């Protein structure tokens, strides 16, 4: 075999980039929307938690957005060490997000990315087409 020693150190698994890596790659143009979508929908997303169930929204923006984070460290940087949170997958975000809201990933991070409500609708449509044809 050329270039292989016959061993598979990765156990046959393809390593997927972290959400933080995908955000950096997406904002720098290294990956496109489809690749970002694939990572986002399968990764864990950290969300600030309030007193009542549901997403916490920022309404002091042109359109309401919901802050979400690629890691607990990013969330803690934004909302403090003792902040409460919950986690969902990106796919669950797309399923549960109320209409008319966008999201901002890693709002205080070096590579923050904002998806307005229209972009979220496009992500949902893309997901539905991939799932149901």
Show the residue positions of the predicted features:
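An interfacial alpha-helical scaffold signature
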Residues: 1-133
């Amino acid at each position: 075999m050329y270039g292989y020693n016959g061993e598979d150190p990765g156990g046959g698994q393809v390593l997927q980039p972290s959400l933080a890596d995908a955000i950096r790659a997406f904002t720098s143009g290294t990956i496109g929307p489809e690749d970002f979508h694939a990572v986002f929908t399968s990764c864990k997303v950290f969300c600030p938690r309030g007193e009542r169930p549901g997403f916490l929204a920022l309404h002091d923006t042109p359109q309401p957005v919901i802050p979400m984070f690629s890691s607990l460290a990013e969330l803690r940087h934004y909302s403090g060490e003792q902040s409460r949170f919950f986690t969902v997958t990106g796919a669950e975000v797309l399923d549960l997000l109320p209409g008319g809201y966008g999201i901002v990933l890693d709002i205080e991070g070096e590579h923050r990315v904002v998806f307005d409500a229209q972009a979220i609708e496009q992500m949902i449509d893309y997901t539905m087409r991939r799932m149901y044809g």
